[in-house]
Amino acid sequence: MIFKALTILLLVATVLGGSAYFVYDLYYKDKKLDLIEQTAPPTPVPSPTPDPSVAAWDELKPAAAKDTIEARESVKTFITTYPESVRLPEASAALGRMNLVLFRDTAATPANTVYAVKKGDSLAKIASLTKSNVEQIYWVNQLSSINLQIGQQLLIPSLNTSAVLIREKSTLIVFNHGEFFKEYPIVSLTLTGGASKGEFETKVADRVARKGETRVAFGAKDYAETVRFVLLSPGSVSIHPAPTPAADGTIPPNPPGIVLSLADFNDIFALLKTGTPVTIK
């Protein structure tokens, strides 16, 4: 009888003890672990590694503000060394500015030649003699008139350009003899058809200057009053300058195609002659 009672008590103790442990394991143990986690010091987060290109560009910026051959080489080295730098857009803009300035310097661009104007010369005649382009000679010499003076020194540019439009960045990049020349930000971009997707090859089909419905030749007295644009084909894409404000101050809407600031369009109109290849991607 006593043995039976002891056995029952032992079974009851076993059941109650197991239940107590189960409650502890299910509730109190988790609570204790939560408390430990809450009071434990946070796991230290490693500091991000500083981008060395930022410091390198900051050090180079004073030199990059100058338009010298040495400064240009330093910027080229930076771009080659840090092709993924967050400062790459700034460096590319500086390089483009330098290239444009130094292109008009025969010491910096020895491929360009100098021509001394002779009696009976005209821009058209000089362009024919030097196998150049009238508008490119006018542009590179920053002329304000087609009238020339005997003995006047004219720079004859060495240009063999191509262009790449990058949709995602909304930029038009010009290359000369296969090397980066300058990157131009696009003000407005509207592309359709094949030009709007994938990699699309086209070329300059025409460079147009019109006054009303009449086409005007370069050098004509009313050429400055014309509306100019560049036509690309295939793709029926056009390049335009941004519209100027109307007399009442309102700004007309941008035309479809590729729209650049007026200053940038003036460069592009001269740099991209008929037949120049353009890649859109």
Predicted segments with their positions:
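Short beta-strand-centered segments at strand-helix junctions
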Residues: R215-G219, T250-L271
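Hydrophobic single-pass membrane-insertion segments
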Residues: G17-L35
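Alpha-helical solenoid scaffolds that mediate protein-protein interactions
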Residues: T39-P42, F78, Y82
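Gly/Pro-biased beta-strand-loop elements
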Residues: S158-A246
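Extracellular LysM carbohydrate-binding repeats and other cell-envelope/extracellular binding modules
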Residues: T80-P110, N133-I166
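Primarily a LysM-type cell-wall glycan-binding module
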Residues: V45-I69, S74, L102-K131
